[in-house]
């Protein structure tokens, strides 16, 4: 929302799918362990997605949703899926706070286990996401009180052991849990590497113990922690913290950590850190793509997180400093953050997905991969209301007809199909695409995207059409949501405070 029947496997696509983030000799995992699936946030599935024609089961992700008029301004945590098809669901339990994590059978939705967490939200405008992560397919890591992380074993079993870890030392937390709970909070989804180390942004409030300042934390598999303040990581005393909801990303070899930071006014940097030490390796000031003398903005009301491409390039969505109908920009950098490349024409609350180029059969360019992004043109911010999804070529350019800026070339776009009666002065206006990270299936050459008309669509990247759809709800304006693909090909989407498991039906 603007701020204001299975397919046959395709052999070529299989090869493409495996090459995005996995060595050719490795059998790709079938799970969906975190936000954007992997630590690079590619959102590329390794199983064949089912056609979205039928709701198999559903479950609430909010037991007390609070509506602002007809809108729902809550970012719900991404569902996760284990290799054995347990779906992990983050549930908001109270009107203003309170959370629990559920494990449900992917085939039936039956509840397997419930794990409470003492995590409490920070002060906020839109409700930020709470994002657990599966580490090494064996344990579930959950945000807890006071900047701690809860580690639950055996995520596919009804029972599992739970231990708490603190990046500043569990003995310190145990000595004064109330003070830490009041002054230190995890404020981003958790990101785990292949060794089981976990990374996240945290925010401090008031006078936190141990001299803790808002920044970036790392916990090893054994629970040993380290941290760096946002100020020190950026080398800029004006910097405050990591934006709420912005999950750190890792390079393909896991050695580099990418994270955004901002000052109180919302301007800031994208940083690259050593993932072992959190030492600074580089930074880039985030600038407006139309006027690079002005700073772009980062919002606590979004979930934009860095995406790392198969070649190591880094993409990050920001808000604009110059008018472009509140679309923002998808900024593009090399792995060292020393070279600024052609931006995409949309960045607000969006984490781009990676699309292997041959999945788009009409594409005739030279890039090995493309980007999938939201591409709304908000009628409420001066746009036409022709809200689209887009496949972009990050290495080709065009002139943006909205802003006049040089942006990534559009390869394929599709407009929402449902007219938007809220904008009678814009006769072409359609309901917004409601997605912050979209599941991509190279095996069927498809992407799965939510819309504020209450439907989940399969975008066929061969025909360019919205080939399949299923009604989830009557539709609502809401904070953007993720889609994922489970190990059996079930599609999962959130709409109006409910998680839906979708397939082709009986």
Please identify what each model-predicted range represents.
Residues 10-19:
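Bacterial N-terminal signal peptides
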Residues 18-29, 41:
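C-terminal region of N-terminal signal peptides and the immediate post-cleavage residues
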Residues 27-30, 35, 44-73, 81-89, ...:
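Extracytoplasmic/lumenal domain signature
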Residues 7, 73-74:
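Short, conserved micro-motifs enriched in small and acidic residues
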Residues 7, 21, 408-409:
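Intrinsically disordered, low-complexity regions enriched in polar/acidic and amide residues
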Residues 1-10:
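Bacterial N-terminal signal peptides that target proteins for export
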């Amino acid at each position: 929302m603007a701020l204001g029947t299975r397919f046959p496997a395709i052999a070529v696509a299989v090869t493409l799918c495996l090459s995005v983030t996995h060595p050719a000799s490795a059998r790709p995992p079938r799970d969906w362990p975190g936000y954007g699936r992997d630590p690079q946030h590619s959102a590329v599935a390794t199983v064949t997605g089912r056609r979205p024609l039928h709701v198999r089961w559903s479950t609430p992700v909010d037991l007390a949703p609070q509506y602002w008029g007809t809108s729902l301004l809550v970012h719900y945590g991404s569902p996760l899926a284990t290799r054995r098809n347990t779906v992990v669901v983050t549930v908001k339990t109270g009107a203003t706070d309170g959370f629990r994590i559920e494990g449900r059978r992917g085939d039936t939705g039956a509840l397997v286990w419930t794990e409470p967490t003492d995590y409490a939200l920070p002060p906020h405008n839109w409700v930020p996401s709470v994002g657990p992560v599966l580490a090494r397919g064996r344990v579930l890591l959950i945000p807890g009180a006071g900047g701690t992380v809860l580690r639950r074993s055996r995520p596919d079993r009804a029972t599992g052991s739970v231990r708490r870890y603190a990046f500043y030392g569990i003995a310190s937390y145990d000595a004064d849990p109330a003070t830490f709970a009041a002054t230190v909070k995890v404020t981003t989804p958790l990101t785990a590497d292949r060794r089981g180390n976990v990374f996240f942004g945290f925010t401090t409030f008031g006078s936190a113990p141990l001299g803790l300042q808002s920044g970036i934390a790392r916990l090893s598999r054994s629970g040993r922690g380290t941290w760096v303040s946002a100020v020190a990581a950026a080398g800029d005393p004006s910097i405050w913290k990591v934006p709420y909801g912005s999950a750190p990303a890792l390079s393909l070899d896991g050695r580099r950590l990418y994270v955004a930071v901002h000052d109180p006014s919302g301007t800031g940097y994208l940083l690259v850190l050593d993932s072992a030490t959190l030492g600074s390796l580089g930074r880039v000031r985030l600038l407006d793509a139309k006027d690079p003398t002005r700073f772009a903005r980062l919002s606590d009301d979004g979930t934009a997180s860095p995406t790392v491409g198969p070649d190591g390039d880094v993409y990050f969505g920001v808000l604009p400093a110059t008018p472009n109908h509140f679309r923002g920009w998808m900024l593009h950098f090399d792995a060292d953050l020393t070279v600024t490349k052609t931006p995409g024409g949309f960045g607000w609350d969006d984490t781009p997905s990676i699309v292997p180029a041959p999945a788009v059969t009409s594409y005739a360019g030279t890039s090995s991969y493309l980007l999938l992004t939201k591409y709304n043109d908000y009628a409420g911010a001066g746009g036409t209301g022709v809200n689209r999804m887009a496949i972009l070529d990050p290495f080709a350019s065009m002139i943006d007809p909205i802003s006049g800026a040089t942006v990534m070339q559009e390869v394929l776009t599709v407009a929402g199909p449902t007219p938007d009666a809220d904008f009678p002065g814009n006769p072409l206006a359609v309901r917004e695409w409601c997605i912050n990270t979209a599941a991509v299936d190279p095996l069927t050459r498809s992407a799965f995207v939510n819309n504020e008309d209450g439907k989940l669509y399969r975008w066929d990247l061969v025909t360019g059409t919205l080939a399949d759809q299923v009604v989830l709800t009557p539709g609502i304006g809401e904070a953007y949501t993720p889609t994922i693909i489970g190990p059996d090909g079930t599609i999962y989407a959130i709409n109006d405070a409910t998680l839906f498991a979708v397939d082709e039906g009986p």
